A protein has these predicted regions:
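Short amphipathic alpha-helical/adjacent loop interface patches that line ligand
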Residues: 10, 14, 99, 141
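N-terminal start-of-chain detector that recognizes signal peptides
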Residues: 2-4, 15-17, 32-34, 65-66, ...
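Amphipathic, non-membrane alpha-helical segments in soluble helical-bundle scaffolds
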Residues: 3-11, 37, 41, 88-92, ...
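Short acidic/polar alpha-helix capping motifs at helix-coil junctions
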Residues: 6-9, 21-23, 66-67, 83-84, ...
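Short, contiguous alpha-helical
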Residues: 27-74, 117-172
Length: 172
């Protein structure tokens, strides 16, 4: 695993979300506040909360304590209350700043190939490695970028007519 390849994706996520969401005049499903079905607003809030409480803090736990200190459980639904009253553009700015700081921190950590094998203890999944945590960070981003795209596509479900057969994003 090459950290440069991971940071390249991590750096691009804010740009990608900005391109999709910033300044939309008609904001379909930007936040539904529903634990079962997240809109783009919910996703960006979740990503901010992850920047603050998940990826870098957990990497530090692994580097400093190994698997002797379990990770603090992550509240996957904290964004519903935390970001009420904010605009999408505010959240995008917050995410951009938090991500830039975390990518810089990740670089400053100077993680070695050997350190990627260090183990931590996830409260639900059990033993995980630092390399797995960092790879998950990237795939987590991509998963949520896809979720945002789905949230933007869904309002057009009925309007596409029979072309829906060629648009699997509408069936997820």
């Amino acid at each position: 695993m090459k950290l440069d390849a991971l940071t390249e994706v991590l750096e691009r996520t804010p740009e990608t979300l900005n391109a999709l969401l910033r300044g939309l005049k008609h904001e379909p499903r930007l936040g539904v506040g529903d634990e079962e079905e997240w809109g783009p607003f919910d996703v960006v809030g979740h990503l901010i909360f992850g920047e603050e409480t998940d990826w870098i803090p957990r990497a530090r736990i692994i580097l400093e304590h190994g698997d002797s200190r379990p990770f603090v459980p992550f509240d996957r639904f904290a964004q519903f209350e935390r970001f009420k009253g904010r605009s999408m553009d505010e959240l995008l700015g917050m995410f951009e700043e938090a991500r830039a700081a975390n990518v810089e921190t990740l670089r400053e950590m100077g993680i070695t190939a050997e350190q990627l094998l260090l183990r931590g203890m996830h409260p639900e999944l059990g033993p995980v490695t630092l390399g797995q945590l960092l790879a998950t960070w990237v795939v987590h981003d991509l998963n949520h970028v896809a979720q945002v795209a789905e949230g933007l596509a869904k309002p057009h479900d009925a309007a596409v007519g029979s072309w829906k057969a060629y648009l699997p994003i509408l069936d997820r």
